[in-house]
A protein has these predicted regions:
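Short, low-complexity N-terminal intrinsically disordered segments enriched in polar/charged residues
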Residues: 1-38, 42, 136-138
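Short beta-strand segments enriched in hydrophobic/aromatic residues
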Residues: 40-41, 98-100, 128-129
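Short beta-strand segments that buttress and anchor functional surface loops
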Residues: 67-68, 94-103
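Hydrophobic/aromatic beta-strand elements that line small-molecule binding cavities or substrate pockets
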Residues: 79-85, 97-99, 110-116
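Short beta-strand edge/turn micro-motifs at domain boundaries
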Residues: 108-138
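Short, mixed charged/polar active-site loops
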Residues: 54-56, 106-110
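A solvent-exposed, acidic/Ser-Thr-rich amphipathic alpha-helical stretch
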Residues: 14, 33-90
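Short, cysteine-centered beta-strand-loop-beta hairpins and adjacent loop/turn segments enriched
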Residues: 73, 100-108
């Protein structure tokens, strides 16, 4: 199992949402799906473009299905290219340059994540791929 460190992220602000984001990345590296799910509301919705078509995941059971994909990640570095957050409502928009190790080798891509929080937990998560590992742009 990969050892998670805060060094997996760079350029993350020292804010409440910055700490939640760093914890999210740490939990991904630790492959702790249950703890990741605890960051979400029970009725959370995640919309993903990772597969070049929209996928919708609603509730804990479907979110678990989405996060099963992290089990193949052996390393992850996230460098923040853009960060914006608000406090009321509590929201986050982040664009990340990602490098990771998978069973197929090293992959580099760009993600764009947006979170809407309710009660300190993620209620809506837009998980978008903006540049795929093959270099194509979404």
């Amino acid at each position: 199992m990969t050892t998670a460190t805060v060094n997996a992220t760079s350029n993350v602000p020292d804010t409440k949402l910055g700490r939640l984001y760093e914890e999210h990345i740490r939990l991904i590296l630790a492959k702790d799906i249950e703890a990741i799910l605890d960051q979400y509301t029970d009725d959370a919705v995640l919309i993903s473009s990772f597969e070049k078509k929209p996928r919708y995941f609603r509730g804990r059971k479907q979110l678990r299905e989405h996060f099963q994909g992290i089990l193949g990640i052996e390393g992850l570095e996230s460098k923040i290219a853009f960060w914006a957050e608000t406090q009321n409502p509590e929201t986050l928009m982040v664009v990340e340059a990602i490098a990771m190790q998978t069973a197929d080798g090293e992959a580099s891509m760009r993600f764009a994540d947006s979170w809407v929080l309710k009660g300190g937990k993620i209620a809506i998560h837009f998980a978008g791929m903006t540049q795929y590992p093959d270099g194509s742009v979404a």
